[in-house]
Amino acid sequence: MAEILKSACPLNCWDSCGFHVTVENDKIIKVEGDPSHPITKGKICGRGRMLETRTNSPERLLHPLKKVNGEFKPITWNQALDEIAFNLKEIKDLYGSTAVLHSHDYANNGILKNLDQRFFNGYGGVTEIYGSLCWGAGIEAQKWDFGDAYGHAPDDVLASKNIVVWGRNVARTNMHFYEKLLEARKNGANIIVIDPLFNATAKIADKYISVKPGMDGILAAGIMKEVLRLGLEDREFIKLHTQGFHDVEKLVDSLTIEKISEMTEVSIENIQMLAKVFADRPTSTYMGLGLQRYKNGGNTIRLIDALVAVSGNIGIHGGGANYANLQVGQSFDIGNLTLSGRKTSHRQFSIMKQAEEVLAAVNPEIKMIIVTCGNPLTQLPDSSVVEKAFSSISTLVVVDQFMTDTARLADYILPTTTSFEEEDLYYSSMYHHYVNYGPKLVPAPGEAKSDLWIWTQLAERLGFGDDFTFSRNQWLEMTLQSLADKGITLDTLKERKTLELPVKPIPWSDFQFKTPSGKFEFTATYKGELTLAVPDESKWSNPELAQDFPYNLLTIHPLRSNHSQHYHLFPKAPQLKVEVAENIAADKQLKDGDLVRVWNKRGEVRGSLSILPKAHPNTINIDEGIWKQFGGSVNSLTSSRESDNGLGSTLYDCLVNLEKIT
């Protein structure tokens, strides 16, 4: 008999949805939204629904695999674990533990996925990656400005007179905030969307501003310039609660409004209009992630933060520079899981440059890579170098559910469970502040095992099994210790499924910032002044490159896949689609459906052309995440350069050319 059970979405996404999952005869039948969830209210996206397909897919990896003479052969778990443990011990004895690289990302938001750190710390410490492909530049930027990256509670947008959605297509990536926008608009709020692409969110806006890709920070400086010229700044907030304002005044005086308009390709009239909008408090700003995926990405977020501060929209209802909400994740005792004090050795590679660093590593060289919660061959920039690096080492171990592009390179593949086959807690530090409970609903197929089981077995073989003697419930209780006095326990979560975390709904309302000065820092204490930086690949920084490669390439999040996780589950094999601005199609006499080649000095891809109405001139988009085996990863075109603050990617800082294939 079928049962409908509550669960939660594990995907690394803004919304962290509640689920109703239909289970019959130990099989997932259907995934739908939980109407009782306080934020997601029964609505989920196609990516969440496809978790049923993912769980039941006949392509699931069911047994440990070892590559022998270029072909994968099934082996027992004992053989796989014994051989991997032997290699780990030998590598540590001969070269040191940092000859092992742990390459990982956030394919699953389960809180117990952090136990991988406990294993590697117990092993002695390995080469870890730092930074983020996704949002690292912006997180670091807000730490310089505010001391941390905190966002307003979802309902607070309903207090906004004006709402500026800057580079964030919430209709695609944050659907429950999209619902809030519709409600706010019905209540009379004025919605402005700033984006190079005229997307589904722009369609509900009162005003759409098309901006040159990578020039959002310059636009923010221009708006600030007009706010100051018109005398609309919040002088009291600036005087009492900020540091370095005179540096901002000098900065915006260094460019004329005409030059700013030329660089951003936004009219002076629209810049002046935006200045009045920001000064018409309360105005909330909701930033996306794409606008900081440039060399100047951290500075871009800092300039937008500065604009929000100058206009007096910090710490007030209906305001905020909303980028992330790290106070959600900070509510948990993750340190209880990781045992960071156990490691005796340590080395770090940048997540963006990990391929180059693998190839260049000495003292010690990288001898083994273990990949968890990621598909680096598809998702890392400059994928040809990634393939070379991951093919160059002695042993590659991949923990996954499917034969991804990365798994195909592996020496060992360890089949792991889906979220419905293990118990965990789920949250997102991107939007709302609720934690969801996800019970184990069905048994794992074949011999698939949880990540936790794998780490436990390896730890036992390597002599630190005592660090993994706890039950799954005990692990979860460890993470909730800091919340027990607030009534948030594992028992209450199991009973109620979703609980609100005790975070500040209006961050910085007390104007007590976490910076060294205790103030909002226009000029960061340790990192210095704001600058009017531009992307590395632009006509302003590299005119010769821009002449050969005149088009800005964006690689936005796909509608139907969470990065690379869903493409292989489509009923029809996915095909690479090249979306272009109308002027490109007109200049090159192209039409929908034409086969085109997109290239630069790093690589090329081929796909079917689609014309994007109202997209910013000279802009191309190719959704990220498509696998090499389905036609080529767009990351063969992107650069591994780091952002200005060293913690973000430059995936959108990419010039290309395009031609029709005849």
What is the predicted function of each stretch?
Residues 445, 451-496, 569-578, 584-662:
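Long, contiguous, secondary-structure-rich segments that constitute the structural scaffold
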Residues 223, 243-354, 497:
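Active-site phosphate/pyrophosphate-binding segments
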Residues 154, 420-444, 454-455, 459, ...:
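Glycine/threonine-rich phosphate-binding loop and adjacent beta-strand/alpha-helix elements that clamp
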Residues 114-182, 187-194, 201-203, 217-221, ...:
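Extended redox/cofactor-interaction regions of prokaryotic respiratory oxidoreductases
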Residues 29, 128, 234-235, 271, ...:
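Acidic/polar loop patches that form or flank catalytic/metal-binding clefts of enzymes
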Residues 163, 204-205, 255-258, 286-291, ...:
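Flexible glycine/proline-enriched surface loops and loop-helix/loop-strand junctions
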Residues 1-230, 254, 259, 267-268, ...:
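N-terminal export/assembly segments and adjacent metallocofactor-ligating motifs
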Residues 7, 51, 70-74, 105-109, ...:
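Hydrophobic alpha-helical scaffolding
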